[in-house]
Amino acid sequence: MRWDDGSYSLRMTLQVNGYVSPYPVDPMPDWVAALRDSAAPVWLFAYGSLMWNPEMPFAERRPAPLRGWHRSFCLYSRDYRGTPERPGLVLGLDRGGSCQGMAYRLPQDGLGAAIDQVWAREMAGEVYRMRPVSVTTPEGRIGAYAFVVRRDRPDYAGRLSLDDAARIIAVATGGRGTGRDYLANTVRHLEELGIADGPLHRLHERVEALAQQS
């Protein structure tokens, strides 16, 4: 199906781990749809839950630092980890710094279905855009695609101070649980993957301290 502007659309309701998003899945641009038939390898850069819970088939995974972007709790969540009245915060990939993540090569067999699957998971709510990036892996430098935040969207929180972010996360609860649990699980999974993220560790410590005070 195509929108009036010619872009390819996955008109579906997004459901991840039993939670149904209130948002439609964003239209898929033609250049992304063309990747579904790509003869060249298609790599995705993962910085958050895609690293430890990809929910998509993949043929290969490599550690991959990305320069020029960093992992940050920079997006308001009014459903998954918060409510419209009390928004929470979720991870995004924002400009500046660097980010240690994972690069996934999607399988050539069933490539289109894999791209559709990850698009349906990531592209709800008009808060991300998919863009090409260059990452370094142990086997060399490769081109990949990453889902980065859209700074023009109202749910973009910007660069909050440590205390401001901690106060939001410590009390936020949404359809998929508390912001506190989301942050703790993120830190734990990063540690299991051998990834040190100082800002997230400091944020986690501050959130836990606030929780002990309440």
Report the location of each language-model feature:
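A glycine-rich, hydrophobic/aromatic-adjacent loop/helix-cap motif
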Residues: L10-S214
